[in-house]
């Protein structure tokens, strides 16, 4: 089996952090988002090769993947952002077996091992949502096979959202579908992989729909903090190495080595990077990078990059790397 991981996007909804860090490498609960997905891939044990479709800050993604995951891999640049079908099309030279396609700006609770015994042409994983208008949604028949997939419907034809996780056993028909889609007029400059799946269905393919237990978005600032909270609650809590006088920790938290906390309350739902200092402050529901210094502040719902200095500030904020903000506490 081959694995395709498209991660060429610029992460505009996560700026300023994605100016310097690729979206899949932003951390929640002390780990890069893509690491949660790759853990599931490693557990499968029958992966022949991973094809990373790279783009923005591609060198950082490539260096991280090579250093962290001992799987045969290739890296293909998507120089033009022409959509998800365009991204997967770049992997064509390497597709000669069933493929698992994973978009890594979300974290999911799914048993990927079911692909080993699947006899369907493919599997698509979904999650029932109320705000269906934001997603591609899937319609099924009475046997649980997909009959239609529609991007961001205006009418409630389904509430089963496509989460960006697919297994395609009939890889030949997938490539045929992508080739067909690329001959059609693009939608605002992009071709969608979901249209290739619809092509497969129209040609008689059986694509099974499987619901996931949990689906956590890390693709925008508003949801990344909530995903951090969920991952901490699911057992990622880690206590700091150095607790100073007057320090209070409210679980769950993930505080890396070398942090100093004095006369401060940290938590709940805080991830604090290595070497950070928190003094005379309170912080909750916050993701902070490495070597962050927070003094005389009251912070909540913040996303702070590396080497950020916050002094005398109250409230919520998003601050990129190597920035300082000071005010009256």
Region locations from a protein language model:
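Conserved N-terminal catalytic core of the sugar/cofactor nucleotidyltransferase
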Residues: 2-5, 13, 26-27, 31-103, ...
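Active-site metal-binding loops of divalent metal-dependent hydrolases
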Residues: 10, 105-106
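Conserved beta-strand segments of alpha/beta enzyme cores
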Residues: 24, 72-74, 145, 206-208
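Short internal beta-strands
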Residues: 51-55, 126, 287, 303
């Amino acid at each position: 089996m081959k694995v395709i991981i498209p991660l060429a996007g610029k992460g505009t909804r996560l700026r300023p952090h994605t100016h310097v860090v690729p979206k899949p490498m932003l951390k929640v609960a002390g780990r890069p988002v893509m690491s949660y997905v790759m853990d599931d891939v490693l557990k499968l044990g029958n992966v022949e090769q991973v094809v990373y479709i790279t783009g923005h800050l591609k060198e950082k993604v490539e260096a991280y993947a090579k250093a962290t995951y001992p799987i045969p891999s290739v890296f293909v640049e998507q120089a033009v952002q022409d959509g998800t079908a365009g991204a997967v099309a770049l992997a064509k030279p390497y597709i000669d077996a069933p493929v698992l396609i994973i978009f890594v700006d979300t974290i999911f609770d799914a048993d990927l091992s079911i692909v080993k015994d699947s006899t369907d042409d493919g599997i698509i994983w979904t999650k029932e949502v109320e705000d269906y208008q934001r997603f591609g949604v899937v319609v099924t028949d009475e046997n649980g096979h997909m009959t239609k997939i529609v991007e961001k419907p205006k009418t409630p034809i389904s509430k089963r959202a496509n989460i960006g996780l697919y297994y395609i056993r009939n890889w030949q028909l997938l490539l045929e579908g992508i080739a067909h889609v690329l001959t059609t007029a693009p939608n605002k400059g992009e071709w969608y992989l979901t249209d290739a799946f619809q092509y497969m269905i129209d040609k008689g393919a059986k694509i099974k729909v499987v619901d996931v237990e949990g689906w956590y978005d890390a693709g925008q600032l508003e949801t990344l903090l909530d995903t951090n909270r969920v991952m901490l609650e699911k057992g990622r809590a880690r206590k700091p190495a150095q607790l100073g006088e007057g320090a209070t920790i409210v679980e769950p938290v993930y505080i890396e080595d070398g942090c100093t906390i004095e006369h401060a309350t940290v938590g709940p739902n805080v991830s604090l990077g290595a070497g950070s200092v928190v003094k005379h402050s309170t912080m909750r529901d916050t993701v902070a990078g490495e070597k962050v210094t927070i003094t005389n502040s009251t912070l909540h719902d913040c996303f702070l990059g590396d080497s950020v200095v916050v002094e005398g500030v109250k409230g919520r904020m998003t601050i990129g790397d190597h920035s300082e903000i000071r005010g009256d506490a």
